[in-house]
């Protein structure tokens, strides 16, 4: 649970869930290994850290856990946005969403495209491919996967492992079952049965759905424009891009929720306080982040 590589560095967080920061991790020469937007990161089965950027000189940059450069690949994803890893036990696969090309790809760990998903034309909202601007994916253990169309028509699309559409739900709208900004999605295995947790970023909430798309719960996070939920152990982690709204640049932090969906710690954010069961509005408290977009928690608990 620590990023402490240096001693006597500031500690961030609350309620015993605290971290110190190593600002030198992953520092590379930007002329040789440039990064435009650092959108998401995952850890593979070898323990390496993969970074996704929409810089087409090197869309995927791979580091070892100490932050040293290993390799990079990818020149064909100008809108690289969402990065999800599928670990089968035998090999790893990546799912990348491209908001500029209006596509989602299943890719080998070294960059070979295996499957391409285009706009689902059978759904009326997607008669034009430009309506499909996918931001995130989540993969079930059986290989089926979900796509969150967070910058497009706001549908959640469920596919089998071969890429055939099975179901869709959500869409843009005002009711609780609809979305305004379905920016992120993950599978939550912490309960008796798996469920989906989906971001509605501009509304400052996570929404829990059954795997077949039935709304189960809304988790209110006032003031927090949360990106994708990331679950590690009993905790849910999320980057808060901005607070209290998307119009406030350079105002982000990282939030951590326990399995009761209570915010227990904020890195760079205000101390979480509840009154009569309701969370007080959150905000940036320390400028250690500008506009954080994702959280990757490694196998040692470092962020």
Model regions: which residues?
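Short loop/turn segments that connect beta-strands within beta-propeller blades
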Residues: 63-68, 108-112, 160-164, 210-214, ...
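Short loop/turn segments immediately following the C-termini of beta-strands
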Residues: 54-55, 99, 150-152, 190, ...
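Residue position within the beta-strands of beta-propeller blades
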Residues: 51-52, 96, 147-148, 198, ...
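Beta-rich, blade/repeat-based domains predominating
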Residues: 31-46, 76-92, 122-144, 174-195, ...
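Blade/loop signatures of beta-propeller domains
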Residues: 2-24
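Surface-exposed loop and turn segments in beta-propeller and other repeat-based domains
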Residues: 23-32, 74, 114-132, 164-180, ...
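Loop/turn-rich, solvent-exposed surfaces of beta-rich toroidal or solenoidal domains
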Residues: 192-193, 222-273, 278
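WD40 beta-propeller blade core
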Residues: 61, 71, 105, 115, ...
């Amino acid at each position: 649970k620590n990023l402490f590589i240096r001693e006597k560095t500031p500690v961030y967080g609350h309620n015993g869930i605290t971290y110190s920061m190593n600002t030198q991790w992953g520092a590379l020469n930007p002329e040789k290994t440039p990064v435009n937007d650092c959108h998401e990161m995952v850890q593979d089965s070898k323990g390496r850290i993969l970074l996704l950027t929409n810089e087409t000189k090197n869309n995927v940059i791979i580091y070892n856990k100490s932050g040293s450069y290993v390799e990079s690949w990818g020149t064909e994803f100008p809108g690289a946005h969402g990065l999800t890893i599928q670990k089968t036990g035998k090999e790893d696969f990546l799912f990348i969403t491209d908001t500029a090309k209006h596509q989602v790809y299943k890719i080998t760990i070294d960059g070979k495209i295996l499957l391409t998903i285009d706009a689902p034309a059978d759904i009326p909202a997607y008669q034009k491919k430009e309506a499909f601007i996918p931001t995130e994916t989540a993969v079930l253990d059986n290989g089926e996967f979900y796509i969150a169309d967070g910058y497009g028509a706001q549908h959640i699309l469920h596919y089998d492992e071969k890429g055939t559409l099975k179901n869709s739900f959500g869409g843009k709208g005002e009711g609780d079952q609809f979305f305004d900004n379905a920016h992120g999605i993950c599978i939550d295995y912490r309960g008796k049965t798996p469920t989906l947790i989906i971001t509605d970023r501009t509304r400052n909430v996570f929404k829990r759905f059954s795997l077949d798309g039935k709304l189960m719960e809304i988790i209110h996070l006032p003031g927090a424009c949360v990106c994708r939920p990331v679950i590690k152990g009993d905790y849910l982690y999320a980057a808060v891009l901005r607070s209290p709204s998307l119009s406030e640049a350079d105002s982000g932090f990282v939030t951590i929720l326990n399995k009761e969906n209570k915010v227990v710690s904020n890195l760079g954010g205000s101390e979480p306080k509840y009154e009569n069961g309701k969370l007080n509005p959150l905000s940036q408290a320390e400028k250690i982040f500008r506009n954080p977009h994702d959280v990757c928690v490694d196998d040692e608990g470092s962020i």
